[in-house]
UniProtKB/Swiss-Prot annotation:
Its main location: membrane. It is a peripheral membrane protein. Transmembrane segments: none annotated. GO terms for cellular component: plasma membrane; proton-transporting ATP synthase complex. InterPro entries: ATP_synth_OSCP/delta_N_sf, ATPase_OSCP/d_CS, ATPase_OSCP/dsu. Belongs to the ATPase delta chain family. The gene is atpH. It comes from Psychrobacter arcticus (strain DSM 17307 / VKM B-2377 / 273-4). It is found in: Cell inner membrane. GO terms for molecular function: proton-transporting ATP synthase activity, rotational mechanism. NCBIfam families: ATP_synt_delta, PRK05758.2-2. It holds the Pfam family OSCP. This is ATP synthase subunit delta. Keywords: ATP synthesis, Cell inner membrane, Cell membrane, CF(1), Hydrogen ion transport, Ion transport, Membrane, Transport.
Length: 207
């Protein structure tokens, strides 16, 4: 059976294409973020897996949660989380529209096809579509040691040139790499670490 990421791709593309054509890219991103956050919650996911709950009830619950917790005047935890993700100041009193009919139908379709569990992956793929459309990509760089400013600038410049897009680098450190880096952009992974090279050598020697 295909993994969740593969199953989510067509839904994410359909969602982004519709949102892009209708000038609602940011709104759909907000809707998907909250829906994905809810689905990732263990207690709620257990409820979603309950066959006794109808598909219509499940999708309606997700929509109602957004409308009452985010698109209302209430200062809820969901709204605070969305504000933080978007870089909105807590005291800005940012307002969000209610869920659109189109998004409500999208969630309903996922629910009827027993695909609500895909929402976190749909959200991630949607964000990638948005980044590509803006010519901006996220590069997740893991290195054995913290990058210096010069190394970071050089890596960012090389990635931008090879990908023909502006690149936002997200850094993490993993001492087990021994040396070098691993880079993940979308579904592509570049392993230029010493650990990776040793693993390749081991594979070649035992082949």
């Amino acid at each position: 059976m295909a993994d969740l990421s593969t199953l989510a791709r067509p839904y994410a593309k359909a969602a982004f294409d519709y949102a892009n054509e209708n000038g609602a890219v940011n709104e759909w991103e907000d809707f998907l973020f909250v829906a994905a956050t809810v689905v990732n919650d263990k207690s709620f996911s257990t409820w979603l897996d309950n066959p006794a709950v109808s598909a219509e009830h499940k999708s309606a619950a997700l929509v109602d949660l957004y409308d009452t917790q985010v698109a209302s005047a209430n200062d809820s935890a969901f709204k605070q989380l969305l504000d933080a993700t978007k870089g909105v100041r807590p005291d800005s009193n940012a307002s969000y529209p209610k869920v659109s009919v189109a998004f409500s139908n999208f969630v309903k379709q996922l629910s009827e096809q027993e695909r609500l569990a895909l929402l976190p992956e749909v959200y991630e793929h949607y964000r990638r579509h948005k980044a590509v459309s803006l010519k901006q990509l996220d590069a997740y760089v893991t290195s054995a040691y913290p990058l210096t400013d010069d190394q970071r600038d050089m890596l960012q410049a090389r990635l931008a040139a090879s990908l023909n897009a502006s690149v936002v680098i997200h850094e993490s450190v993993d001492a087990s790499l021994l040396a070098g880096v691993t880079i993940k952009v979308g579904d592509k992974v570049i392993d230029d670490s010493m650990r990776g090279k040793l693993q390749q050598l081991k594979t070649q020697l035992t082949a």
